[in-house]
Amino acid sequence: MTPDISTKKVVHVIFQSREPKRSGEVHAFIDGLNDDEKAHLVAIAWVGRGAFEAEDYAEALSTAFTEATTPTADYLMGMPHLAENLEAGLEALDIDVTEAEEGFYDN
């Protein structure tokens, strides 16, 4: 199973979450995602931090949906090393982010 969120959106969260002064922007961006995208973002972060293996992505996604009790933006912004977890999750899932990273600041 592959994540049903655009790589560009995940890269947006990665880049913005590295800038402490932009935490409000990241929070608003995550809040603006639909519920499916939010669950996929959480599942990618969980794979990245080692809570789930890449081959267990479907289980991570299901868990993200069923255990969502805190607003997703609050949960993710409170996660230590969010950017690194998302990067590691994308890498574990064999998702190439080169194009999304190159175009990030072109917008």
Describe each PLM feature range.
Residues 67-107:
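Helix-rich interaction surfaces within compact, conserved domain-sized segments
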Residues 52-63:
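Short, surface-exposed beta-strand/strand-loop-strand elements in extracellular ectodomains
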Residues 9, 37-41, 56, 85:
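Residue-level detector of well-ordered alpha-helical segments, enriched
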Residues 22-31, 51, 71-77:
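Noncatalytic partner-interaction/assembly domains of nucleic-acid and motor enzyme complexes
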Residues 3, 28-39, 80-81:
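Structural motif
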Residues 2-24:
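Short terminal alpha-helical segments
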Residues 39-49:
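Short, hydrophobic/amphipathic alpha-helical patches that form generic packing surfaces
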Residues 16-20, 36, 67, 96:
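Surface-exposed polar/charged interaction patches
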